Amino acid sequence: MTERPFWQQKTLSEMSDDEWESLCDGCGQCCLHKLIDEDTEEIYFTNVACNQLNIKSCQCRNYEKRFEYEPDCIKLTRENLLTFNWLPATCAYRLIHEREDLPQWHPLVCGTKTAMHRERISVRHIAVRETEVVDWQDHILNKPEWAR
């Protein structure tokens, strides 16, 4: 019998830093800008990608120095995970926290990001560069399937 993968054996708080980092599927959904209504605090999702996001690969161009380039970049940690209630339903951190398993397309399960892109989980098919946007309101999406 094969040993169960670490995400089926451990809680998020029990994971090593490397295990924690490996949970990220690299979909880029965190890297799309969100707009917040100042009156209602409702979050509006956009298809506008952070300048540091390589849209084709859905990876940060400067991951190690991302906070220097983008001070508003989020840092998802074990301590602040619950404050990011907008995380997509497909997010591994959210799934593991909710005691769900990773989907079959997740790179830790299938070994590649190809399935994630094919299933259109990543943002590569909808994202636009921040520098190309004139009116941000034109880029507000209806609440996507991946957002609850």
UniProtKB/Swiss-Prot annotation:
Disulfide bonds: none annotated. InterPro entries: Puta_zinc/iron-chelating_dom, UCP006173. It holds the Pfam family CxxCxxCC. It comes from the Bacteria. HAMAP family: UPF0260. Belongs to the UPF0260 family. This is UPF0260 protein PC1_1943. It comes from Pectobacterium carotovorum subsp. carotovorum (strain PC1). The lineage of its organism: Bacteria, Pseudomonadati, Pseudomonadota, Gammaproteobacteria, Enterobacterales.
